[in-house]
Amino acid sequence: MSADSAPQRILLVTGLLGAGKTTALRTLEDMGWEAIDNFPIRLLDRLLETEPGSARMEPGAPMAIGFDTRTRGFDPSRTIELVKKLSQRSDLQITTLFLDCAGTELERRYNETRRRHPMSEDKPAATGIAAERELLEPLRRWADVVITTTSFTTNDLQQAIRDQFGGEIATPTTITISSFGFSRGMPPLADLVFDMRFLANPHWVDDLRPQTGRDKAVGEYIRKDPAFDEAFERIRDLLLLLLPRYQEQGKAYVHIAFGCTGGRHRSVFMAEQIASALREAGFSPTLLHRNLSSRAADLLEGVKG
């Protein structure tokens, strides 16, 4: 590690079974961490010398490692001893997260999923939970961060993880803006769909019919519609409100679709204008026109108007 490079962030994630470890690790992975579950901590020093297995991970990327009482060779005392030793390295920043939860809530979760607690054998889940809590107590006392998930929903825990460990690691939301023709069906995976069929239709102007929403004359025609400016501004402002919120909530992908009858004029023009406005605001949307070159869409538009 050079003198200027930051130490690699290592987050050890443990806690009571059913308290949310899997959700925490998945959230961290969505945030750009390399996540590994059920890893024997005694092998941690060897793992740190291994190159990342994922092509998207850079050497030194933050790493989240999950382990619990089921992990092979689980031993709280040895884990604490090893981590204390590794924490002395200047190239590592190791944090331990412990996920806790009230016993009654854990019982409810086990009953709801109809799963048996691994330490309860033929006894009630409460017995296994109590034994596990006693075994984990040294780790709970030693952990840097304790999150109690008793009253949490899955979304609550995801947000708590982002708030606690987001820091400078912010994976931007991938934004796709598309145009389409309703006559060919709606895009099945769009998050937001805007219907542009209220705007004046260039299809009915002979000179504009063979052109598309990417041509200047078509754009000028659509802009003359008294409703265009206000509609554009309201849609733009709504997206500028929503997109940062989506990113804060960890939404990886947002697909914004604009539709008109054939998908060649009004929807194309609005999609182009909104994409340009979002780029000016600092976003990097990908722009797709599904039916732009479709002769069939043009024929259908002539039928439906």
From Swiss-Prot:
This protein's record includes keyword Cell inner membrane: no
Residues reported in the UniProt entry to bind ATP: G15, L16, L17, G18, A19, G20, K21, T22
Stated name of the protein: Nucleotide-binding protein Saro_2904
Organism of provenance: Novosphingobium aromaticivorans (strain ATCC 700278 / DSM 12444 / CCUG 56034 / CIP 105152 / NBRC 16084 / F199)
Assigned protein family: Belongs to the RapZ-like family.
PANTHER family for this protein: RNASE ADAPTER PROTEIN RAPZ
HAMAP family attached to this UniProt entry: RapZ_like
SUPFAM superfamilies on file: P-loop containing nucleoside triphosphate hydrolases (SSF52540)
Any single Pfam family the record assigns to this protein: RapZ-like_N
Keyword Plastid (UniProt): no
Function text: Displays ATPase and GTPase activities.
GO molecular-function terms, A-Z: ATP binding; GTP binding
Keywords noted in UniProt: ATP-binding, GTP-binding, Nucleotide-binding
Residue numbers binding GTP: D68, T69, R70, T71
